[in-house]
Amino acid sequence: MHHLPCLLLIRHAQSENNALEDRFRVPDPGITELGVAQSKKLAMAMAKLAPTVVYCSPFLRSLETTRWIAKQTGAVPVVRQDIYEQGGCHSGFQAGRRIAQVGMNRETLSRQYAGWHLDERIGDEGWYDLDHFETADEARNRAHQVRKWYESESQMHSDRDRVAMVIHADFKLRLLEAFLEEDSIEEQLGDIVNTSISRLSLSKGRWRMDYWNVFSHLDPHEIST
């Protein structure tokens, strides 16, 4: 395996759904006023970490969080289709009644995030490619595919690269399970704070977690989960 840079896994800022009861949630919420404040603080922290590559989920809450990172660091984000939240884009909140939604399409993303790189899998209809609410097992399989892709990209990175992914709480857990080769990691870890940063690095052929859920860039009143 060629050199692989460390990987920063970042949860998006507080979304409008995070601040609402389940029954009021919408398929693709933006971020709240608190979320904007969190994003600004995150962006300042990321300027010090100086990521050279920033991948983000196609969900609006990740895109809006990433916009602040891009402004502060100058990195041009890459919107990847396959790092969305577990469950996918859907309406409804009750088990068995969730209906798949397609998410933003390529034209909308190109217009709202001009200059960003868009995954070729994001099409004219939208980015969510399943016709159902994604299961936990499907999300785990997807996380393993993301790991395989990241490791296959090793020859594309230099020793100076620092890679960040702006993603979601549940899929962050699935990625940790895939990279750390753990069956279930949820019970070992606490709540994931909005805009918290975790870092993975490769050592002697195995991935390790250098730190988890760091949110020291936030003031106490800005912390949310």
Describe the residue ranges of each PLM region.
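Active-site metal-binding loops of divalent metal-dependent hydrolases
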Residues: 13, 169, 213-215
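Surface-exposed cleft-lining segments at the edges of enzyme active sites
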Residues: 25, 93-96, 123-140
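Active-site-proximal alpha-helix that buttresses catalytic centers in soluble enzyme cores
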Residues: 5, 10-79, 136-140
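A short acidic, helix-capping loop that chelates divalent metal ions and anchors anionic groups
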Residues: 17-19, 86-92, 127-131
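Phosphate-coordination/substrate-recognition cap region in phosphate-metabolizing enzymes
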Residues: 42-119, 190
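Beta-strand elements within well-structured catalytic alpha/beta cores of enzymes
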Residues: 6-11, 55, 157-168, 175
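Acidic, low-complexity terminal tails and accessory targeting/binding regions
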Residues: 1-6, 86-115, 155-161, 177-225
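A mid-sequence, solvent-exposed acidic-amphipathic segment
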Residues: 130-158
